[in-house]
């Protein structure tokens, strides 16, 4: 192949004809696991620095960016619940873990002179602003990165669902789910070498086939509000900007997409 990387454009996504950005307001969902890199637990400062640089590139392109960050690199409520902990208590601990990640990312961004605000669904005024929808939108309009912490503030809801909820609330045009995989497959590619990777999917197909994109509540929220979802590998440098330009860097789920 001569080492040539061939990028194609996704047919069901609007592409800016002048090569500019296809979206102006984006909700980026970062999994907690993405922040720990190759570590088994916690936060890898080098990975966080790389993510911050990508976010800076997005901001410099004039795109408004809000972020929902998970907490699975520190604590997973579902696993703790399965081990016997009260589910609501476990979920609240997980929400606190997301705030730790949000503050870490905020620090990395501010060291690059990127104005950033952390808004949390659980009040902790000493370290973050409370989540108020109008305030979040105003921060975005002023060119600040907005990081949402503490999930939705309610147990039994995932941070994926929070991402869909916040995207609808702030009128984001798309949800980017940045993970450690390069898209959505019909089976686990780690165990099935013949697993098929999808380029585009419909919400209905994702729900009917129970594909592991986001949880069903998040998918339904995006479907009801016609918010497309892009799933891509955060580990590939430049993928966030490429996704905003409409390049096929992963799997796109949308109302007008075909299963391909």
From Swiss-Prot:
InterPro entries: AceGlu_kinase-like_sf, Asp/Glu/Uridylate_kinase, Uridylate_kinase, Uridylate_kinase_bac. It is found in: Cytoplasm. Keywords: Allosteric enzyme, ATP-binding, Cytoplasm, Kinase, Nucleotide-binding, Pyrimidine biosynthesis, Transferase. Residues 37-42 are annotated as: Involved in allosteric activation by GTP. The keyword Kinase applies. UMP binds at residues 71, 91, 152-159. Signal peptide: none annotated. Its main location: cytoplasm. GO terms for molecular function: ATP binding; UMP kinase activity. Allosterically activated by GTP. Inhibited by UTP. Catalyzes the reversible phosphorylation of UMP to UDP. NCBIfam families: pyrH_bact. This is Uridylate kinase. The gene is pyrH.
């Amino acid at each position: 192949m001569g080492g040539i990387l061939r990028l194609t454009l996704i047919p069901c996504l609007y592409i800016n004809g002048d090569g500019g950005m296809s979206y102006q307001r984006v909700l980026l969902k970062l999994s907690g696991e993405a922040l720990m890199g190759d570590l088994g637990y916690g936060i890898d400062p080098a990975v966080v620095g790389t993510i911050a640089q990508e976010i800076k590139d997005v901001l410099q392109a004039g795109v408004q960016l809000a972020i929902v960050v998970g907490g699975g690199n520190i604590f997973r409520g579902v696993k703790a619940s399965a081990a016997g902990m009260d589910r609501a208590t476990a979920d609240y601990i997980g929400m606190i873990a997301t705030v730790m990640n949000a503050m870490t990312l905020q620090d990395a961004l501010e060291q690059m002179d990127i104005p950033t605000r952390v808004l949390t669904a659980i009040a902790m005024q000493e370290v973050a602003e409370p989540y108020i929808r109008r305030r979040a939108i105003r921060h975005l309009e002023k060119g600040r990165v907005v990081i949402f912490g503490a999930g939705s503030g309610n147990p039994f809801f995932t941070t994926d669902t929070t991402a869909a909820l916040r995207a609808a609330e702030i009128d984001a045009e798309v949800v980017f789910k940045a993970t450690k995989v390069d898209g959505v497959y019909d089976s686990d590619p780690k165990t099935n070498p013949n697993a098929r990777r999808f380029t585009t999917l419909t919400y209905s197909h994702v729900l009917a086939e129970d594909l592991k994109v986001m949880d069903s509540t998040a998918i339904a929220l995006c479907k009801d509000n016609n918010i497309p979802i892009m799933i891509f590998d955060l580990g590939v440098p430049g993928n966030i900007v490429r996704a905003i330009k409409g390049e096929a860097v992963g799997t796109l789920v949308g109302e007008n997409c075909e299963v391909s």
